[in-house]
Amino acid sequence: MGKSPAMPDAGGANSGYLVTEDGFTLLLDCGTGVFAELRTVCEPTAVDAILITHMHVDHFADLLPYAHALAYPYGKSAARPRLLLPPGGRELLAKIVELLGIGYPVVGAFEVEEYDPDAVHTAGPLTLRHQEVPHYVRTWACELSGSQGGRFTFGADCAPNDALVKFARDTDLLMLEATEEFAPFVADGDVRGHMTARDAGELARRAGAKRAALTHFSDLLDPQVVRSEGEAGFGAPVELVQAGLRFTV
């Protein structure tokens, strides 16, 4: 649905990825612009579950228009998707709703759960695992395994780290952010929170991923440079994520 970093691409959306398995639909992240993109491919009521990796606005902001749609245009008869939030996500979302003075039931529009990152969960036919990764707020990478054993691992937003290498070992598809251009960007008290394309490629190579895809990079960057840097790190071709791109795992 969208691959943009915090500043959305022109005509694009922030983080949002639709995963389907055996008629079950899960939306992974729901950043700015994702809900509009979602409506181009399916009814909002067709989504069975929404999984949020961390509580940065470019990964959850469109839960607000999503909730409005479920509360009003689709009415009380609409099925409520499961909303799987990271630890502390329910309280933060409730505070945001209160501060904005939103008059519709954002939390009540969904079946809200906070997932235990240390546990293995199921969502329909999908098996979910989580791994905390270094970012500016607490963030969890996730693995979605299908009924036939295919594994899709999403690194969320993170700096290079060994924990994700171990977590993603031999995955079928590893999708990693490539936010930084060519050199690390350090902020928030010397904490690094993102990767370059080369970092992402190297992490995918170390993990032994069968395929690697790069996401969360700006349209201000030259996509061919992003690709070449990622491939230099991975040692094999990489995919550049864009709206409408489909993978089979």
Q: Where are the language model's segments positioned?
A:
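Conserved beta-strand hairpin/beta-sheet module of binuclear metal-dependent hydrolase folds
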Residues: M1-E43, W140-A156, L173
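Short, surface-exposed connector motifs at secondary-structure boundaries
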Residues: D22, V47, K76-A79, Q148-G150, ...
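Active-site neighborhood of phospho(di)ester-bond hydrolases with catalytic His/Asp-centered motifs
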Residues: L27-G31, D48-M55, P86, F152-A156, ...
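Active-site metal-binding motif and surrounding structural segment of the metallo-beta-lactamase
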Residues: G33-R82
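Structured loop/turn residues at beta-strand edges in well-structured enzyme cores
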Residues: C42-T45, A79, G108, G124, ...
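Active-site neighborhood of divalent metal-dependent phosphoester bond hydrolases
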Residues: G75-P81, G89-V112
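Catalytic core of the metallo-beta-lactamase
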Residues: E113-D170
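Cap/insert and terminal regions of metallo-dependent hydrolase folds
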Residues: A159-R246
